[in-house]
Amino acid sequence: MYHDVSYLLSRLINGPLSLRQIYFASSNGPVPDLAYQVDFPRLEIVLEGEFIDTGAGAALVPGDVLYVPAGGWNFPQWQAPATTFSVLFGKQQLGFSVVQWDGKQYQNLAKQHVARRGPRIGSFLLQTLNEMQMQSQEQQTARLIVTSLLSHCRDLLGSQIQTASRSQALFEAIRDYIDERYAS
């Protein structure tokens, strides 16, 4: 399987990798000692293999998605080889990673970051997905929200804005000032 982040996003959005079941991780109760817990929302998408997640209370298979809200936790029980695609929604950037468990150890297959800029589309989609936790049986709607969120991620990856360094920005500002006031 090819592990380029943009390619994976496109395959999840347009096929042939289709989203199946959307699960919602636990965000209440005591957190197990080795559980994964971060302050940002994230998606865990199974690409290959299968694993049981205590936080979701289910066995996840290819195409299944686990949504972990900010402050929530998940606790995967790796019993056979599996490959997952994770999207972490930080305040300033998105983080993408593809991780494989081969039955003995983890291997990072891909890792990428992109700045969260522009309209707050992603924030509103995450808020909508948070609301879906109360109606987790509405799977068609949950799949469409996750697909929209993945599409937004692909849009951000495709239009990465290059930010000039501070010295470059200062140089350009001085040059523009001189051009505006002293050019003849």
Question: What is each PLM-predicted segment?
Answer:
Residues G118-G122, A142-V146, Q162-S184:
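A short, Lys/Arg-enriched amphipathic alpha-helix from helix-turn-helix/homeodomain DNA-binding modules
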Residues F40, P81, S165-Q168:
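Short, conserved loop/turn and helix-capping segments at secondary-structure boundaries
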Residues E44, L125-M132, A142, V146-R154, ...:
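Hydrophobic alpha-helical core bundles mediating ligand binding, dimerization, or RNAP-core interactions
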Residues M1-L60, W78:
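Generic protein-terminus/edge-of-domain signal
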Residues R42, T84, S184:
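Broad gene-expression machinery/nucleic-acid interaction feature
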Residues M1-Y23, V65-Q137, L150-G158:
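A hydrophobic/aromatic-rich effector-binding and dimerization subdomain
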Residues L47, R154, D179-A183:
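Short, locally clustered residues in the helix-turn-helix/winged-helix DNA-binding domain
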Residues P32-L34, G57, Q137-Q139, Q160-A164:
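Hydrophobic/aromatic-rich alpha-helical bundle segments in the mid-to-C-terminal region
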